Amino acid sequence: MKQYLDLCNRIVNEGEWVSNERTGKRCLTVINADLTYDVSKGEFPLVTTRKSYWKSAIAEIIGYLRGYDNAADFRALGTKTWDANANENEVWLNSPYRKGEDDMGLCYGAIGRNFPKPDGGHIDLLKQIIDDLSRGVDNRGEILTFYHPGAFHMACLRPCMYSHHFSLLGDTLYLNSTQRSCDVPLGLNFNMVQVYVLLAIVAQITGKKPGKAFHKIVNAHIYEDQLELMRDVQLKREPYPLPTLKINPEIKSLKDIETWVTMDDFEIEGYQFHEPIAYPFSV
């Protein structure tokens, strides 16, 4: 929790104003932030200085692992995080690639589970990684990427957290996740949860011990209409101790994640939090 608050304070105190063309808003911005989550010690990085809707965050990462490309599928899992980008983004609404209501296009898991090859075929990057790790193989390129510049125009949004690189040392699994852009007040509390859960659940289904997850953010920012709430409300609150996350031990394979896992398979213990804060969202 301290590293999260340190980043928020750094942006407030040291950030520079940058105009964002896509949203038409200014952002207080810093470049490069590195966060670490020790999954082996159960240090679940859930924000306590406001209520965090952690089930929605986990539902989103599970949707990515399933390769979902439709906001309705994410809603069925338990999150509405894609409703606005799929249905309110003017550029996407006018795109010839949009298939209709709730369509997200080729982004995130839809790319990672079906990555286009130059010869016309596709690679299931996630399955390839799971197969390798289950056999104890680390080819130093176990990378789940959602980043495909040639497909940006075919999606409602470019991926923000776009790369997840798994590494093995003995039987301990590590993760390096890279994020090009982060809406810190709204997005980071979700992203921290997702990086932690991704390492924890991949370690579980491949029979490895989870180690540390390293989370790099390149452009970390607070939108101008979020600044007052962050500076004068959230940063004035005292954080509570971190809670712990329990994952159903019966989840043992990628097929389990794809077919029957629900948010009931995840449990939080000891979560104390302050009142929610309704930060504005920029489409």
From Swiss-Prot:
InterPro entries: Thymidate_synth/dCMP_Mease, Thymidate_synth/dCMP_Mease_dom, Thymidate_synth/dCMP_Mease_sf, Thymidylate_synthase, Thymidylate_synthase_AS. Pathway: Pyrimidine metabolism; dTTP biosynthesis. DUMP binds at residues 22, 180-183, 191, 221-223. Gene3D superfamilies: Thymidylate synthase/dCMP hydroxymethylase domain. GO terms for cellular component: cytosol. HAMAP family: Thymidy_synth_bact (MF_00008). Catalyzes the reductive methylation of 2'-deoxyuridine-5'-monophosphate (dUMP) to 2'-deoxythymidine-5'-monophosphate (dTMP) while utilizing 5,10-methylenetetrahydrofolate (mTHF) as the methyl donor and reductant in the reaction, yielding dihydrofolate (DHF) as a by-product. This enzymatic reaction provides an intracellular de novo source of dTMP, an essential precursor for DNA biosynthesis. This is Thymidylate synthase. The lineage of its organism: Bacteria, Pseudomonadati, Pseudomonadota, Gammaproteobacteria, Oceanospirillales.
